[in-house]
Amino acid sequence: MAKKYDFLFKLLLIGDSGVGKTCLIIRFAEDNFNSTYISTIGIDFKVKTIEVEGKKVKLQVWDTAGQERFKTITTAYYRGAMGIILVYDITDEKSYENIQNWMKSIKENASAGVSRMLLGNKCDIEAKRKVSKETGEKLAKEHGIRFFETSAKSSINVEESFTSLARDILLKSNKKPGPSGREVKLTSTEKKSSSKCLLL
């Protein structure tokens, strides 16, 4: 059977527990929102194919648990990621301050040159804002990465942010030597639906 995509990119969302990583992924992959999601246990992923620069790009978006007790499991997934999205909650200053620790975690565990992006989530809750947009922009600029304020609930900048990161990875991969760029082939045995890893 013919392949239905040109590239497969693995993206990883990291950030403190409760910042809305799962909600962002479900909004992006399924265009759905539910405020009663329980915390992710270990790691989970969703798949969505989008069009970028005339190419069909299949995104495998991995959702990680933000709690410290799952750190050993989640950091194991950094290595194969081509894009890492750092998420904080604009109504929770601590989640923003912890972005520096997540950046350190990327440096220690991810592949060199991985594409990164910073998202300030829950921008629909303006009345409870604790982190200004300028503060987020400043941090992203310091690290030389893209920044978006998003809302999974109101569907603000969700599609745009994922697409822009996919475009960055695609353009970067096109500059690499070799005929295949960063194309990754899936075997027919690989599951195409959502998969969960639970710790009992």
Swiss-Prot record:
PROSITE patterns: RAB. It is found in: Cell membrane; Cytoplasmic vesicle membrane; Cell junction, Tight junction; Golgi apparatus, trans-Golgi network membrane. It comes from Danio rerio. Residues 182-193 have a biased composition (Basic and acidic residues). It is an enzyme of class 3 (hydrolase). This is Ras-related protein Rab-13. Pfam families: Ras. A motif (Switch 1) lies at residues 31-45. Its EC number is 3.6.5.2. CDD domains: Rab8_Rab10_Rab13_like. GTP binds at residues 17-18, 20-23, 40, 66, 121-122, 124, 152-153. Its main location: membrane. Keywords: Cell junction, Cell membrane, Cell projection, Cytoplasmic vesicle, Endosome, Golgi apparatus, GTP-binding, Hydrolase, Lipoprotein, Magnesium, Membrane, Metal-binding, Methylation, Nucleotide-binding, Phosphoprotein, Prenylation, Protein transport, Tight junction, Transport. Mg(2+) binds at residues 22, 40, 63. A lipid is attached at residue 197 (S-geranylgeranyl cysteine). The small GTPases Rab are key regulators of intracellular membrane trafficking, from the formation of transport vesicles to their fusion with membranes. Rabs cycle between an inactive GDP-bound form and an active GTP-bound form that is able to recruit to membranes different sets of downstream effectors directly responsible for vesicle formation, movement, tethering and fusion. RAB13 may be involved in endocytic recycling and may regulate the transport to the plasma membrane of transmembrane proteins. May regulate the assembly and the activity of tight junctions. Switch 1, switch 2 and the interswitch regions are characteristic of Rab GTPases and mediate the interactions with Rab downstream effectors. The switch regions undergo conformational changes upon nucleotide binding which drive interaction with specific sets of effector proteins, with most effectors only binding to GTP-bound Rab. InterPro entries: P-loop_NTPase, Small_GTP-bd, Small_GTPase, Small_GTPase_Rab. Its cofactor is Mg(2+). It comes from the Eukaryota. A motif (Switch 2) lies at residues 63-80. Belongs to the small GTPase superfamily. Rab family. Regulated by guanine nucleotide exchange factors (GEFs) which promote the exchange of bound GDP for free GTP. Regulated by GTPase activating proteins (GAPs) which increase the GTP hydrolysis activity. Inhibited by GDP dissociation inhibitors (GDIs).
